[in-house]
Design a protein with these regions (language model features):
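Extracytoplasmic cysteine-anchoring/structural motifs
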Residues: 1-52
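Surface-exposed repetitive/solenoidal architectures
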Residues: 49-267
Length: 267
């Protein structure tokens, strides 16, 4: 393994990619754009590249393929709540600390799970959700949260987001959600749209809604199973199209067909 150490600082800017062609000759290493000499054996140092778990695209969006990468995006999005994220593999967050995303004015990017799963989301906090506030430009889609175990110690708990003002599309949550106060499977408050989403699990039965607690906007073709009797605890002038899968009159295949119809309605 060989290393070179330039005499002057080399500045590599975050979010950019740098490609060099390396040629080895008798006098040193030649890189595209610069020549570096006086190189020596690295003395046994490891030359293995660190697996960051993500790559950054030209537009600044993250492509994430493991827990380390998702946590790196989480850290970045705390400073810039418009950064897009796309999952390219299933993610295991078991044993990882999660900071929910979206304070005022809220997350405004696109989080695309591409049908992949996030498992192991297991934590207790004042309020526990993957996202805090999704603003009117924000989108969360094609995401599965499986086997969550959430406890809101000082308020509400929901699977996907505390307050939705954007779009939640084709997302699902399974597991157990409890709280000192209110619980819901997808969102606590809905001021946006929730389409083709489902929840299957156990909620603390206090002001709970399998899809949302308070709905002020639109819920379309959503389904749930589990111990809760209503898709929305309270509807405040919105539209609620949410159906419980009881295994008798409504089965999960019915739910799948209904959600697929909603997702392809505009095609």
């Amino acid at each position: 393994t060989f290393y070179f150490r330039p005499q002057n600082d080399v500045v590599l800017e975050a979010g950019n990619r740098y490609t060099y062609i390396v040629k080895v000759n008798a006098t040193g290493l030649t890189l595209e754009g610069c020549t570096i000499g006086d190189w020596t054996d690295g003395g046994g140092e490891s030359g293995a590249a660190e697996d960051l778990g993500y790559s950054i695209q030209n537009d600044g969006s993250y492509m994430v393929y493991n827990a380390k990468g998702l946590l790196a995006w989480n850290k970045a999005v705390q400073k810039d709540e418009s950064i897009n994220c796309t999952l390219t593999a299933d993610i295991d967050l078991t044993g990882k600390d999660w900071t929910r995303i979206g304070t005022w004015p809220g997350y405004s990017g696109v989080f695309n799970g591409q049908g992949h799963r996030i498992k192991g989301l297991n934590f207790s906090a004042a309020t526990t959700e993957l996202f805090g506030l999704l603003n009117h430009r924000g989108v969360i889609k094609n995401l599965q949260l499986i086997d969550v175990n959430l406890y809101g110690s000082n308020g509400s708990a929901a699977g996907i987001v505390d307050q939705n003002e954007g779009q939640i599309i084709a997302c699902s949550v399974t597991g157990n959600i409890s709280a000192y106060g209110r619980t819901c499977g997808i969102a606590d408050l809905n001021y946006g749209s929730i389409t083709a989403c489902w929840f299957n699990g156990t909620l603390k039965d206090y002001e709970s809604g399998a899809i949302v607690r308070y709905n002020y906007a639109t819920i379309t073709s959503c389904y749930w199973g589990g111990n809760v009797g209503q898709g929305a605890f309270r509807n405040e002038g919105g539209t609620v199209d949410a159906t419980k899968v009881d295994g008798a009159t409504v089965k999960w295949q019915t739910a799948v067909d209904g959600m697929n119809t909603a997702l392809t309605a505009g095609d």
